[in-house]
Amino acid sequence: MKVLCFGSLNIDYTYRVDHFVGRGETLAAESLQVFSGGKGLNQAIALARAGAETWVAGAVGEDGRFLLEELAAADVRTDHVSILQQVRTGNAIIQNDKTGDNCILLYGGANRAVTEAQADVALGHFCAGDWLLLQNEINQLPYI
């Protein structure tokens, strides 16, 4: 059995803040960390760690090439990830406050540029008995 995670691949910019920025407010962050993220990426890595033969499909910009390296290091196949020119990788701006709560601003970027042709090619490499895992952060869900 193979699993295809067709979903978002994001760069997460995580800011540690005293409190969430309010309307009209400028707030200095205590720290900034950059992580790989996106529901598709996170789910693919979790499945691979659990022993599943896992592929991910989606899209990144040139700035997201490091996400493919992280997926490969986790034994996730990236054959069906497109690297797009002139489109930024999807990203999340995450505020984490001192209580552990968060607020997230999401930019779809390349996640919103998946094509029907790309979906057809990716899905064509899987068959009955294989699994398809989707989430709502890509643009071709109605087609897929």
Indicate residue ranges for each PLM-predicted region:
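Glycine-rich phosphate/adenosyl-contacting loop at the front of the ribokinase-like
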Residues: M1-A57, F66-E69
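Ribokinase/PfkB-type carbohydrate-kinase core domain
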Residues: M1-L9, E69-I83, I94-I144
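A structural motif shared across PLP-dependent enzymes of the aminotransferase-like
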Residues: R16, S36, E62, T89, ...
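Acidic surface patches and DE-rich sequence motifs
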Residues: V21-G22, G61, D97
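Thr-Gly-centered strand-to-loop micro-motif
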Residues: E30, G37, G90-N91, L134-Q135
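Beta-strand->loop->alpha-helix junctions that form or flank phosphate-binding loops
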Residues: S31, A57-E62, T78-T89
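Short glycine/serine/threonine-rich phosphate/pyrophosphate-binding segments
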Residues: K39-N42, R88-T89, L141-Y143
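Short Asp/Glu-rich motifs
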Residues: R65-L67, G90-N91
